[in-house]
Amino acid sequence: MISGAEVFIHDGFDTIYFEETEQKGHYETLDPIAGVIGRTYNLNINIFDNEEMHHYYAKSTMKDNVTQIDSITIKDVAMGGMQFNIKGLYAYFQSNTDPSVNYLIDAAINDSLLNESLLKCAAYSLAGASGFYVNGPEFIKLFGELPLHIFGNDKNGNSILNEGDSVTLYLYSITQEFSKYISDVNGNIGSNPMMGMPYNVSTNIYPKGKAVGFFEAASVVKSTVIY
C-alpha cells in the first residue's frame, strides 16, 4: 500500500483526482464518476519517498460491453447429461463480437456482493463463441449451457440462496491482460506443493519491476431476478 501519494487519471478530456480515505493506501474520487467505452485512461501516481520523487503510471482502454443482459435464471446445474444438486445462474445475452473481450462475473444476494474483490471473481473468454447469443439454442448445441455463477453452501452446509432472495448478476467487460493478471495472482496464492513454484505476476504499471498491481478501466452491465 502507498500512503500520501498524489493519484490522478487523465483521459484526454478531464483530469480526475483521487483522495486518500481514512484507510491508509486507499484512494477514492470525491464524486461518483462514470467511464466512457473506447476511451483510454491514464493513471499517474506521484510519491515522495526516501528524499526522492517516484512516478508510476499505467493506461487502460475501456472495452465495449454487451448491450444488455436480456434475462437471467437460477436452476440446477446440468453438465454432460447429468444434473447436480447445486444452483447455477444462467444469463441470456448477445455476446460481443470482439474475441479479445473477456468477461468477469460477480453476483450479489440482496445487494450483498458475494466477492468483495474482483480478484476472487471468475473470468471467462468466449473467443471461440464471440458473437453468439449466450445460452441460446445454437450456443447450447455447440458448447452446452454455461452457468456464469454457481452458488455454494454456507459453512453449515446450507444453501446461501433462499426463496424470495434478490439476485443480481454483474457482467464486466475486461481485457485479456487483466484476465491473465487475475489468473497469475490466484496461481500464487496458497501453499499447495502441486501448484509449482511462484512466478512473477503480470502488471501494466510502469516503471517495470518497480510496482505490482494492475490498472483496468472496465465497463459493467447488470441484471436482477427474484429467486
Regions found by a protein language model. Give the residues of each.
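A sequence/structural signal for flexible, mid-protein segments enriched
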Residues: 1-227
